[in-house]
């Protein structure tokens, strides 16, 4: 998870987030090279006193600076499109969880079970135990099996919300009257934190999300107790 004064991104926990990190590094390198070239050209223009008074046109240079940006844009667009299609692909999810946003809490329903649903509220600061995180802990965590594809159906009861868990590369808008879906798969067990990422009112900052990814056997035990 994130920590104070962190310079980089959070560690990837899902295949999608790993792809996003690679794409970030790929794009950042291209931007760095372009910025360095532009800075070098500006430095040359400011330091040299020579001028090409006899040069009226440069067809070759114009051709290069037309084709080269097009190639660069293609190099950025192709990996981006690949990840977009990967994020939209849903193949035989093992579990479906319906998530509803409210002012200002989340409710969850495990649709594969008859009566497995609960609300998830933030734990107030004065009720936190030692070691728990301020503004990030909830009274009911979303327990999910690791290394399995889980489909999240996301909507809202009132205003716009956004269900986001950065370490899993997830951010899906919760829109009233509309059902959005996304998939997640965690490669390792642990607690993964997120927050509502759409300003939704005065208590927008107090809508944390906590996913507890556990082995399948633990999930089956938990679901049997909850039902």
Swiss-Prot record:
Catalytic activity: 4 Fe(II)-[cytochrome c] + O2 + 8 H(+)(in) = 4 Fe(III)-[cytochrome c] + 2 H2O + 4 H(+)(out)
Cofactor binding note: Binds a dinuclear copper A center per subunit.
Cellular component terms (Gene Ontology): mitochondrial inner membrane; respiratory chain complex IV
Lineage: Eukaryota, Metazoa, Chordata, Craniata, Vertebrata
CDD domains reported for this sequence: CcO_II_C (cd13912)
Mitochondrial intermembrane topological domain: 1-14, 88-227
Protein's UniProt name: Cytochrome c oxidase subunit 2
Species of origin: Vulpes corsac (Corsac fox)
A biological process term (GO) from this entry: ATP synthesis coupled electron transport
Enzyme Commission (EC) number: 7.1.1.9
Residues that, per the record, bind Cu cation A2: 196, 198, 200, 204
Quaternary structure (record): Component of the cytochrome c oxidase (complex IV, CIV), a multisubunit enzyme composed of 14 subunits. The complex is composed of a catalytic core of 3 subunits MT-CO1, MT-CO2 and MT-CO3, encoded in the mitochondrial DNA, and 11 supernumerary subunits COX4I, COX5A, COX5B, COX6A, COX6B, COX6C, COX7A, COX7B, COX7C, COX8 and NDUFA4, which are encoded in the nuclear genome.
Positions with a binding annotation for Cu cation A1: 161, 196, 200, 207
Top-level class of the enzyme under EC nomenclature: translocase
Location(s), subcellular: Mitochondrion inner membrane
Family: Belongs to the cytochrome c oxidase subunit 2 family.
PROSITE patterns reported for this sequence: COX2, COX2_CUA, COX2_TM
Residues passing through the membrane, by range: 15-45, 60-87
Function statement: Component of the cytochrome c oxidase, the last enzyme in the mitochondrial electron transport chain which drives oxidative phosphorylation. The respiratory chain contains 3 multisubunit complexes succinate dehydrogenase (complex II, CII), ubiquinol-cytochrome c oxidoreductase (cytochrome b-c1 complex, complex III, CIII) and cytochrome c oxidase (complex IV, CIV), that cooperate to transfer electrons derived from NADH and succinate to molecular oxygen, creating an electrochemical gradient over the inner membrane that drives transmembrane transport and the ATP synthase.
UniProt keyword list: Copper, Electron transport, Magnesium, Membrane, Metal-binding, Mitochondrion, Mitochondrion inner membrane, Phosphoprotein, Respiratory chain, Translocase, Transmembrane, Transmembrane helix, Transport
């Amino acid at each position: 998870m994130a920590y104070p004064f962190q310079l980089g991104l959070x560690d990837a926990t899902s295949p999608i987030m790993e792809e996003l990190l690679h794409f970030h590094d790929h794009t950042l390198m291209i931007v760095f090279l372009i910025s360095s070239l532009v800075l070098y050209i500006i430095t040359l223009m400011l330091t040299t006193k020579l001028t090409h008074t006899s040069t009226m046109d440069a067809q070759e240079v114009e051709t290069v600076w037309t084709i080269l940006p097009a190639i660069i844009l293609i190099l950025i667009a192709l990996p981006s499109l690949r990840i977009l299609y990967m994020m939209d692909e849903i193949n035989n999810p093992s579990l479906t969880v319906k998530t509803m946003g409210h002012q200002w809490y989340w409710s969850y329903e495990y649709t594969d079970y008859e009566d497995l649903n609960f609300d998830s509220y933030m734990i107030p600061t004065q009720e936190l135990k030692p070691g728990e995180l301020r503004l990030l802990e909830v009274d009911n965590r979303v327990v999910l099996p690791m290394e399995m594809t889980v489909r999240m159906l996301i909507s809202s009861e009132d205003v716009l919300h956004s269900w986001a868990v950065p370490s899993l590369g997830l951010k899906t808008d919760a829109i009233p009257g509309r059902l959005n879906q996304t998939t997640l798969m965690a490669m390792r067990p642990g607690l993964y934190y997120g927050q509502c990422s759409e300003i939704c009112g005065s208590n927008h900052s107090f809508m944390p999300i906590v996913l507890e990814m556990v082995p399948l056997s633990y999930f089956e035990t938990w679901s049997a107790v909850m039902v």
